[in-house]
């Protein structure tokens, strides 16, 4: 090879190595943003810039692959997550101690004016933009929910039309040009920097310059030197100083977030590229004055990576999604039906649910309809999204459901004598550790043994025993304590070595270690079977399981088992007979409960009370048994259930679980890996909690 050609090739190779193989194509919406983005690209070759006319155009470009990312507010996170775009948030802005990854939506008026929030009819309003969180979704949703704006719904007229008759005039960038919603605007009324009154500072300037009477912005918008001239409008019709935003606000909402395709590799590229930026301030727009909040909000202190699998719904939270739906008057799936949509996990539960649905029909109408999902977590997501209404879950799953805004509606009762008393003793059970008799296994020598668990995140099978073990060891790596085990989970990873292939041919090997009935060692009976068949040395289950699966009871695999061949172990005691669970247990824990959305609670209770009069333990219709399982164990409800009892209205998930259980969970959650992806997504923002 000639030396000149070789040098040329080496030069090309060096250039190729110096430039990232894939650049992050950032979408911008104005000339000023393009300037800042170009400066970023010059400072960091990991970026390139794509200019579009609006946020929606950027979302469409990302969907089409023309761009990779853009930072948007909550309203646009919602839009980006719709099926026709299918983008999801991967990184959130963090605003520091004043609000972390949330901010407050506030209504601001000039000091000296006297109107309150209930006196806004006929006033002139300034908004950050149509469909944006602080400037539109939250204030208009709040005014509608408080019946200040009286809107019958989209069947009557669009909400924009109702708002235009409520306010004397407005500037709502993104509204129809020439309408009253654009009357106060200074430029083209677009949702871009071409409109001087666009975004937070634009809406504030609309108020400051006297165009409007009220501005809907975020709590950090009013400059420090101007705060004494303005006041906040509170929901109780009073006013407060600007710095009292924590007590006087319309809502606390999730921070702006970066959205992109559902591509983990691209998400990681965006994250690492942003973190590698040097000699460039991502969160400052001073060099591009008077423009502000270019690419990122100027108040951003840092960026925070979101939990994996966070979608727009989980990021925004149920409360915010409810506000957006109220503005769109969205109908959830199946709302024309009065049936409760029950969520079943796996094939066996779905088959039982279908039978229940058929038997629930009266006057050609089913009281129960069935939805299904591959795991409890996926069912909980469906309930949150109104694709399903209810399901019965164990205490650990009540904890996760509660963190995601769901509430307990009814609880399983295992004592028939207590079924006839209303408001009687709450149902509970004992979490126990079971070993084979004469195995020599005790609580004190448990380390290094093989373990059988009902499932990751379950109460008796995981949360209680592993919480106890963490209290002893202060080590979050539980594989050091139990090097081998079976602990079924939605996404099998650790603790799967002892799990077995699925019994049901329909599921194949894919069900191995999955948290659903097709995994033979899943659930209470499954964990006991893991011990009985010699796979494990200890099973963490509830106190009734041995009796339900020995001495001729239970399914075929259990028929030859004897209860006397098993013992309980607990801290500070040698092995004791199974019958001594009251004195040798790991904890007394609340029974399984039916969870649902707060607004659906009364309907779920009403339907289930009727259903158990027909199909309960002493029901009038023998054609179907709600608390029996023919092709498995504990399908939909625990087989030991005698009745369902109402959980008092207003009971939160932590009140239901009790202080002891919550303390155990607080201890266990010191190990961050013990929280599921769903729980992490639901608790990422403090503002997601109502």
UniProtKB/Swiss-Prot annotation:
Disulfide bridge map: 27-49, 126-206, 171-185, 234-248, 343-379, 353-370, 404-682, 419-643, 452-530, 476-671, 486-499, 496-513, 570-584
Residues bound to hydrogencarbonate 2: 454, 458, 460-461
Binding site for hydrogencarbonate 1: 128, 132, 134-135
Keyword Signal set for record: yes
Keywords recorded for this protein, A-Z: Disulfide bond, Ion transport, Iron, Iron transport, Metal-binding, Repeat, Secreted, Signal, Transport
Annotated GO CC locations: early endosome; extracellular space; plasma membrane; recycling endosome
GO molecular function: metal ion binding
Occurrences of domain Transferrin-like (ranges): 24-329, 340-670
Location of this chain's protein in the cell: Secreted
Source taxon at top rank: Eukaryota
Pfam families for this protein: Transferrin
N-terminal signal peptide: 1-17
Major subcellular site: secreted
InterPro entries the record matches: Transferrin, Transferrin-like_dom, Transferrin_Fe_BS
Positions contributing to Fe(3+) 2 binding: 394, 429, 524, 592
Gene3D superfamilies per UniProt: Periplasmic binding protein-like II
UniProt: Fe(3+) 1 binding residues: 73, 103, 200, 256
Gene Ontology biological-process entries: antibacterial humoral response; iron ion transport
Protein family membership: Belongs to the transferrin family.
Binding partners and assembly: Monomer.
Purpose of the protein: Transferrins are iron binding transport proteins which can bind two Fe(3+) ions in association with the binding of an anion, usually bicarbonate.
Protein name: Serotransferrin
Protein species of origin: Oryzias latipes
Gene that this sequence comes from: tf
């Amino acid at each position: 090879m000639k030396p000149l050609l070789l040098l040329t090739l080496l030069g090309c190779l060096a250039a190729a190595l110096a430039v990232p193989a894939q650049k992050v194509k950032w979408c911008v919406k104005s000339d000023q943003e393009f300037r800042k983005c170009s400066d970023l690209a010059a400072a960091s070759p990991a970026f390139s810039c794509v200019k579009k006319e609006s946020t929606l155009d950027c979302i469409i470009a990302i969907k089409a692959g023309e761009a990779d990312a853009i930072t948007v507010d909550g309203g646009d996170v919602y839009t980006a997550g719709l099926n026709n775009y299918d983008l999801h948030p991967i990184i959130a802005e963090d605003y520091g101690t004043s609000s972390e990854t949330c901010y407050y939506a506030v209504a601001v008026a000039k000091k000296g004016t006297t109107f309150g929030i209930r006196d806004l009819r006929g006033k002139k309003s300034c908004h950050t933009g149509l469909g944006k969180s602080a400037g539109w979704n939250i204030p208009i949703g709040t005014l509608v929910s408080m019946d200040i704006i009286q809107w019958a719904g989209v069947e009557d007229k669009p909400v924009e039309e109702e708002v235009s008759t409520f306010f004397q005039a407005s500037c709502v960038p993104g509204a129809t040009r020439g309408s009253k919603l654009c009357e106060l605007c200074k430029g083209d009324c677009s949702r871009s920097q071409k409109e001087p009154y666009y975004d937070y500072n634009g809406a504030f300037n609309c108020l400051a310059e006297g165009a409007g009477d009220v501005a809907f912005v975020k709590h950090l918008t009013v400059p420090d030197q101007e705060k004494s001239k303005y006041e906040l409008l509170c929901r109780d019709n009073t006013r407060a100083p600007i710095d009292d935003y924590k007590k006087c606000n319309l809502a606390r909402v999730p921070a702006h977030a970066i959205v992109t395709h559902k591509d983990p590799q691209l998400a990681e590229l965006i994250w690492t590229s942003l973190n590698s930026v040097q000699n460039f301030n991502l969160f400052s727009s001073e060099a591009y004055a008077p423009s502000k909040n270019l690419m990122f909000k100027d108040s951003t202190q840092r960026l925070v990576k979101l939990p994996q699998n966070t979608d727009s719904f989980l990021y925004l939270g149920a409360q915010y999604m409810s506000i957006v739906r109220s503005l769109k008057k969205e109908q959830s799936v199946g709302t024309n039906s009065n049936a409760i949509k029950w969520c079943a996990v796996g094939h066996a539960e779905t088959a039982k649910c279908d039978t229940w649905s058929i038997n629930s029909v009266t006057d050609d109408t089913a009281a129960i309809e069935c939805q299904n999902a591959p795991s409890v977590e996926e069912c909980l997501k469906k309930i949150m999204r109104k694709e399903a209404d209810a399901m019965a879950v164990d205490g650990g799953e009540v904890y996760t459901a509660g963190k995601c805004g769901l509430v307990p509606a009814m609880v399983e009762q295992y004592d028939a004598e207590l079924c006839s008393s209303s408001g009687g003793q709450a149902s509970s059970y004992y979490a126990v550790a079971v070993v084979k008799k004469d195995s020599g296994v005790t609580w004190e020598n448990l380390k290094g043994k093989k373990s059988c668990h009902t499932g990751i995140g379950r109460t008796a099978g995981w949360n209680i025993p592993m919480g106890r073990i963490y209290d002893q060891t202060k080590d979050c790596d539980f594989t050091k304590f139990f090097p081998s085990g079976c602990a079924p989970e939605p996404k099998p990873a650790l603790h799967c070595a002892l799990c077995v292939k699925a019994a049901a041919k329909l599921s194949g090997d894919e069900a191995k270690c999955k948290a659903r009935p097709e995994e033979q060692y899943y659930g209470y009976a499954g964990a006991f079977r893991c011990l009985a068949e010699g796979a494990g040395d200890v099973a963490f289950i509830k106190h009734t399981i041995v009796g339900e699966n020995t001495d001729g009871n239970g399914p075929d695999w259990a028929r030859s088992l004897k209860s006397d061949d098993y013992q309980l172990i607990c801290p500070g005691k040698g092995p004791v007979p199974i019958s001594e669970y009251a004195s040798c247990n790991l904890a007394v824990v609340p029974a399984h409960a039916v969870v649902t959305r707060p607004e659906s609670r009364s309907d779920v209770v009403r339907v289930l009370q009727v259903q158990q009069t027909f199909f309960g333990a002493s029901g009038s219709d023998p054609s179907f048994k709600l608390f029996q399982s023919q092709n498995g164990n504990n399908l939909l409800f625990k087989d030991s259930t005698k009745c369902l009892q109402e959980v008092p209205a207003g009971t939160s998930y932590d009140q239901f679980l009790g202080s002891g259980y919550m303390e155990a969970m607080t201890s266990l959650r010191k190990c961050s890996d013990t929280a599921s992806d769903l729980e992490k997504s639901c608790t990422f923002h403090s503002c997601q909690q109502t």
